[in-house]
């Protein structure tokens, strides 16, 4: 249960980081 929430949080952070990278590449 706890590790599932942790994975969810990590996935969210990774998703946001990926979105930021894509936005940076597109904006460059």
From Swiss-Prot:
One of its GO terms (cellular component) is extracellular region. It is found in: Secreted. Keywords: Amphibian defense peptide, Antibiotic, Antimicrobial, Cytolysis, Hemolysis, Secreted. It comes from the Eukaryota. Expressed by the skin glands. Pfam families: DD_K. The keyword Disulfide bond does not apply. GO terms for biological process: defense response to bacterium; killing of cells of another organism. Belongs to the frog skin active peptide (FSAP) family. Dermaseptin subfamily. Antimicrobial peptide, active against the Gram-positive bacterium S.aureus, and the Gram-negative bacteria E.coli and P.aeruginosa. Has hemolytic activity at 612 uM. This is Dermaseptin-6. The lineage of its organism: Eukaryota, Metazoa, Chordata, Craniata, Vertebrata.
């Amino acid at each position: 249960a706890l590790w599932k929430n942790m994975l969810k949080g990590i996935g969210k952070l990774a998703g946001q980081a990926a979105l930021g990278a894509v936005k940076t590449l597109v904006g460059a």
